Swiss-Prot record:
Pfam families: MoaC. GO terms for molecular function: cyclic pyranopterin monophosphate synthase activity. It is an enzyme of class 4 (lyase). It catalyses: (8S)-3',8-cyclo-7,8-dihydroguanosine 5'-triphosphate = cyclic pyranopterin phosphate + diphosphate. This is Cyclic pyranopterin monophosphate synthase. It comes from the Bacteria. The active site is at 128. The gene is moaC. Homohexamer; trimer of dimers. InterPro entries: MoaC, MoaC_bact/euk, MoaC_sf, MoCo_biosynth_MoaA/MoaC, Mopterin_CF_biosynth-C_dom. HAMAP family: MoaC_B. The keyword Metal-binding does not apply. NCBIfam families: moaC, PRK09364.1. The lineage of its organism: Bacteria, Pseudomonadati, Pseudomonadota, Betaproteobacteria, Burkholderiales. Its EC number is 4.6.1.17.
Length: 159
């Protein structure tokens, strides 16, 4: 198994030195879901929630979060993102909203944490905007779907 890179030989946490790594095109895609009551789902779907356009605000929140990841995750490098795309898939049968965030850069370190942070904040924003009518919403299935670029190459989640 590969050693954890955020610890030195004495076991102390440190930010990994990426200075000698080649700048390459990096891409990451992450996803997650929030499940709610059917009536809450209808408010989200129809854009009629009391606080406004839930999906639109969640999209902006995801983009903002990707850009602030290094401020939230202690050992993440600040990254100049070149692209952030946020998609939502609404599944009426299960009253579930899925969020997919794709992040891109040309740099020396990956953008997986940015994609994952964007997903989490988008889903938390949906929760915040709908909690007045449904405190039982469940956020889950947050995961990295794929990453491309860098020394470790490409990776895709199974299934």
């Amino acid at each position: 198994m590969t050693q954890l890179t955020h610890f030195d030989t004495a076991g102390q946490a440190h930010m990994v030195d990426v200075g000698d790594k080649a700048s390459t095109h990096r891409v990451a895609v992450a996803t997650g879901t929030i499940t709610m009551q059917p009536a809450t789902f209808a408010l989200v779907r129809d854009g009629s929630a009391k606080k406004g356009d839930v999906i639109g605000i969640a999209r902006v929140a995801a983009i903002m979060a990707t850009k602030r990841t290094a401020d939230l995750i202690p050992l993440c490098h600040p990254i100049g993102l070149t692209k952030v795309a946020v998609e939502f898939v609404l599944d009426e049968a299960t009253a579930t909203v899925a969020c997919v965030v794709r992040t891109e850069t040309r740099g020396q370190t990956g953008v997986e944490m940015e994609a994952l942070t964007g997903v989490q904040v988008a889903l938390l924003t949906i929760y915040d905007m709908c909690k007045a009518v449904d405190r039982g919403m469940v956020i889950g299935n947050v995961k990295l779907l794929e990453k491309h670029g860098g020394k470790s190459g490409d990776w895709m989640a199974a299934g």
